[in-house]
Amino acid sequence: MKLLLLLSFAIFLSSCVAPSPEPGIGEAISWNELPGWKNDRHAEAWPALLEQCKVLPKKKPAWANICNKAESTGKVNDETARLFFEAAFTAHRINPSKKEDGSPGTGLVTGYYEPLLNGSLYRSAQYRYPLYAVPDDLLRVDLAGLYPELSKMKLRGRVEGKKIVAYHDRSSIDNEDSPLRGKELVWIDDPVAVFFLHIQGSGRILMDDGSMLAVGYADQNGLPYTSIGKILIERGEIAREDISLFTIQQWLQQNPQQAQALLEENRSYIFFSIRENAEENPRGSLNVPLTPSRSIAVDPANIPLGSPVWLDTSYPHEADHSLQHLTFAQDTGGAIKGYARADMFWGNGDMAEKLAGEMKQAAELYVLLPGVGSKPSR
């Protein structure tokens, strides 16, 4: 009898466990529920807000009043900036996407940066790996007019006879008989550096004449991104806990005979344009200069571009060194998919490379949406 009662009680308790919340943007919460909210240097985030206010009201009318107030506020300190955000926005917890097996997921923050490469305008034995401009035959198809439900899909391809077919993949483009001959922007001295520039999306190039050239993302061939890091983990080449930009680079350098075949498994290919101002930070998908540690890339299908996003995470290899930071969703990336998923821009230089290359942190994300609803912080 006692056993039956204990069993019944256990079943009762299990039925009382709250189900994990559905992925997506949750209900409004108070500012006091944002971990570390009052401790951030909110004034440091202010320039990123002003940058996006140059373009956002035209794209999203709800931002017009916010930007008018921000631009007329003048100089701010940490407290006045924080109070501005509290008055203009409502905080919402972002519930992570579920894992492939349907179990509750966790948030993830990685990092990216602006690498420095070596290049030349002319091909030579040293500089023989090209960056390509957008090809003339790259077709972009807007399906929104015919199929509104597909308005968020970006279809790219090329015309072959009377059919639209997939655009050339990495294997075809990197071939000696590349179909893109004549569209080279610049020649680089290292194929691995070229590949990782595709992942970072923008970079600076020290030219052989001593000048500096800056390039940025212009378009993509339309084929899905495949993570070579994930492939190396699945093949047992690198342990999951050791995977990083640096361990992948090291593997490629130590396995030159297998390197090209591995790179070609990522069929996605990025095309570039020359940035007018080599000193300005690269522009993200929102078309504003990115701010180091304050700009993030997100999945725009889940987090609206331009949204302030509060991150509760940690620095790489320093789980006890919290990183609780106000950022802005100003960019996108082929590998950035899901709800509680972000890629932090760290800028350029050695420290930016180190932080971006090692960052793979569990995180909680909170999005700030226009409108008053959250209780003020005390």
Language model: regions and residue ranges:
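Hydrophobic alpha-helical segments and their boundary regions
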Residues: 3-4, 199, 295
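Bacterial N-terminal signal peptides
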Residues: 4-14
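A generic structural signal for short, non-catalytic loop/turn and secondary-structure boundary residues
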Residues: 6, 24, 104-106, 198, ...
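Residue-level signal for mature regions of secreted extracellular proteins and peptides
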Residues: 9-10, 60, 322
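C-terminal soluble interaction/assembly domains
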Residues: 16-19, 27, 35-47, 278-378
